[in-house]
Amino acid sequence: MKSGCGYLPSRSISRGRVFTVAKHLQRAGYCHGICTGEGLEIVGQGDCVIVQWDANSNGIWDREPVKESDQIGFRLKEHVLETLRGATSCEDKGWDKVTNPDAIIIDTFQVVRQDVSGFSPVLTVNMRAASKSEPQTVVDASYSVTGFNL
């Protein structure tokens, strides 16, 4: 196993980010009341996703204040994974970088929904990342969850 600075950080960062996105997907659609709209929106080829869930169990998907909104988005833009609390569109302004483009290059970020008749959908997050200092060091990470609330 390589111990160079490009290998372990990219591996742990990739897996950690994939797990974080997957946990948000697992919550998608939860509502302790009557919420309107879709709990999960997968855009494009799955390189952008917007998730809604009733985080405070007040029966609605809150949009305000933005810092406490029940929406969160993740997208791949210019080889960087970004996130935005309160996202309503993949084109919104103000997205924050989740990965450092000076250290990690994200080649692939994709969310895939697999619907199975009679069951909750399976949601899979796939990511491929490379160390900027060691581009030959590539890490593939994937994590699947069940969308029980969708």
Task: Show the residue positions of the predicted features.
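Aliphatic-rich helix starts adjacent to a transmembrane/signal segment
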Residues: 1-27
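Short linear sequence signals and composition-biased patches located at protein termini or domain-edge surfaces
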Residues: 95, 100-101, 108-150
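Short, well-structured beta-strand/strand-turn elements
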Residues: 27-36
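Generic detector of ordered secondary-structure context
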Residues: 12-13, 66, 137
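Secretory-pathway extracellular proteins and peptide precursors enriched for disulfide-bonded cysteines
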Residues: 31, 80-84, 137-142
